[in-house]
Amino acid sequence: MSKIYQDNSLTIGNTPLVRLNRIGNGNILVKIESRNPSFSVKCRIGANMIWHAEKNNNINKNVKLIEATSGNTGIALAYVAASRNYRLTLTMPETMSIERKKILKSLGAELILTDGRYGMKGAISKANDIISRNPSKYFLLKQFENPANPEIHQITTGPEIWNDTNGNLDILISAVGTGGTITGITRYIKKIKRKKNLISIAVEPSESPVITQFLAGKAIEPGPHKIQGIGPGFIPKNLDLTIIDQVITVSSEEAILTAKELMKKEGILAGISSGAALYAAIKIQQQKKFSDKKIVVILPSSGERYLSTELFSEL
C-alpha cells in the first residue's frame, strides 16, 4: 500500500528510540530527533505552529510569518513555509553557527541577525520592533508561549515514546529551550497515561541556570554559554514547572565532550544540546537509586549543524 505525503511538513515524527550500548549500563535510550524532515526536534513545532495559524485564519499569502530563533526552530519554520508557500522573516543572534545561517537562507527565509550579547531576548525584541512598524503585514509565531508547541509533543512525541517502550520508562531527560518538548511529553505520560511516578528532568546550561535560580527564589542572572538551542536566559511560558521533577545544570564543556563521546562510541551524530541531555542521564544513572531505571533522553539535533563550533574544532 503506497503512502504519498502532500507536502514535506506532513512527514514529521516517528523518530527512532535507540539503546546505548557503550555509554551507560544499557538502560539509556535516546530518541534521535534528527530523523525529522529538517533534521531536528523543532520540525514538530514548526509544522504545528503554522498548521494552527492556518486553521485560525491568522495567515495568508499577503501576511509574512516572523519569529525569533536560535536556529533550529527557524530552520523548521523555513522548511514548512517553503513547502506551504509562505514568506518568512527570522531574527537570530549573530553568535549562532554559520551552518544555521546558510541553511535558513537556502530555504528562502529572510534572516536578520541581532547583537549576540543580548541572546534570544535581543532577537525577540527585534522581531517585536519589526512588527510594531507594520503590524498588519506580519504574524508572530511566539514559539516560547505558543500552545501549539507543547501540544505537538503531547500528540506525537509522547505517544511515540510510550508505544516504543510499552510504557516501560522511569525517567525522561530533555534539555530546555522553549520548554515545549519536555512539557508536552511529560503531560502525555503523566496526565493521559497516568504514569505519575515518571521522573521528568529538565537540563539547562550551568553558565545560565535561570530555571534553577527561579526555583530557588533567587534573582535570575542569565549568562553566555555555548549550548546552542537551549538556555534562552528566561523562563519560557511553555515550560510547565509544575510537572517537572528535577533540574540538572550542565556546562558547555561537559555537553561538547559528551556529544563527541556519543559520536565515537555509539555512532550517533549529535549536537551540543544532545550532549548536555546525555551528560545529565549519565550522572543520574551513576546514582545507586537510579542505576536500574529506564532512562529516555531526547537528542534534539544532529552534529552536522555544528561543524564550525567547538564540537568539531579539534578535527
UniProtKB/Swiss-Prot annotation:
Cofactor needs: pyridoxal 5'-phosphate
The EC number(s) this enzyme carries: 2.5.1.47
Binding site for pyridoxal 5'-phosphate: N72, G177, T178, G179, G180, T181, S273
Binding site for hydrogen sulfide: N8, R35, L269
Domain of life: Bacteria
Subunit structure: Homodimer.
Protein name: Cysteine synthase
Lineage of the organism: Bacteria, Pseudomonadati, Pseudomonadota, Gammaproteobacteria, Enterobacterales
